[in-house]
Design a protein with these regions (language model features):
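Short glycine-rich or small-residue beta-strand-to-loop segments that form or flank ligand, phosphate
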Residues: 1, 139-143, 206-208
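Signature of multi-pass transmembrane helix bundles
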Residues: 2-135
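Predominant activation on well-ordered alpha-helical scaffold segments within soluble catalytic domains
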Residues: 63, 78-85, 119-126, 154-161, ...
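Short coil/turn segments at secondary-structure junctions
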Residues: 68, 140-141, 165, 189
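Alpha-helix capping and helix-loop boundary segments enriched in small/acidic/polar residues
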Residues: 112, 116, 144, 148, ...
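Acidic-glycine-rich active-site phosphate/pyrophosphate-binding loop
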Residues: 116-135, 168-185, 231-233
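Conserved phosphate/anionic-ligand binding catalytic regions in large, soluble enzymes, centered on
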Residues: 137-155, 196-200
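Hydrophobic alpha-helical bundle architecture
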Residues: 160-167, 171-173, 183-237
């Protein structure tokens, strides 16, 4: 096996047998068979030969696009906000996983941490992850193939925008800036980097929030530097 990413599964049930192989990327099936009958077989060269080349992104290009693209072209990001905030609201009203988000909104925790904008961002982001990791029947919008990364790139920015009364246009641009920054960083890490992906997504959020605070390109770039300086090296299990 020469693939960086390779998953092979054999299942038997009710006297029947199925096989599946994923290789090259997380959603790329290269072999499927059922009861000995091959449904799909493209195992030769399963890796990256068929993949489209990455768009040569830079932070400057990401920033300029997020701030200058016609606002209607960015409407797709509204769905990320709707889905991921809905997941947070669901978890805040129920018991999911470790209930970290709900706990952070408890009376004792509010007394200690206060009902600040920062604590709300923490609670809502944690709550959405609680719901997802507990298997709640609620969809979330991913980033770079990860639901938690999608949450971390969306919810802090959405909460900040809502609490500060940001306009719909600025909110939309901030969310696009956040998600594209995360994608830009992720391009350099490969599919199976040991670096925690939520660190990358949080770096994207810092850019979106910096923009909502009135920052320009310099401030956004400094936000990236601050995040990378503090969090690089956090390993994912």
């Amino acid at each position: 096996i020469s693939e960086t990413l390779y998953v092979e599964v054999h299942c038997t049930a009710g006297g029947r047998r199925a096989e599946a192989v994923i290789a090259g990327s997380h959603t790329r099936f290269v072999y499927l068979a059922c009861d000995g009958e091959v449904v799909l077989d493209r195992r030769t060269g399963a890796s990256s030969r068929e993949e489209e080349p990455c768009v040569p992104l830079t932070l400057r290009r990401v920033f300029d696009y997020a701030l200058t693209a016609p606002i209607d072209e960015l409407a797709f990001i509204d769905e990320a906000r709707r889905l991921n905030m809905a997941a947070a609201e669901l978890a805040l009203g129920g018991e999911y996983g470790h209930s970290l988000g709900r706990t952070l909104r408890g009376r004792r925790e509010l007394h200690v941490m206060g009902d600040s904008l920062f604590s709300r961002m923490l609670a809502y982001t944690s709550a959405a992850c609680d719901a997802r990791m507990a298997g709640a029947m609620v969809p979330v919008m991913s980033n770079s193939g990860s639901g938690n990364q999608g949450i971390a790139a969306t919810v802090p920015v959405a909460v900040y925008a809502r609490q500060t009364g940001a306009s719909e246009e600025r909110t939309r641009r901030a969310l696009v800036l956040s998600h594209l920054t995360a994608i830009y960083i992720k391009q350099s890490l490969g599919r199976l980097s040991a670096l925690c992906g939520c660190v990358v997504a949080a770096t994207g959020s810092s850019c979106g929030i910096a923009y909502l605070m009135g920052g320009g390109y310099r401030e956004v770039a400094c936000a990236v530097q601050n995040m990378i300086a503090n969090l690089t090296g956090m390993i994912c299990d």
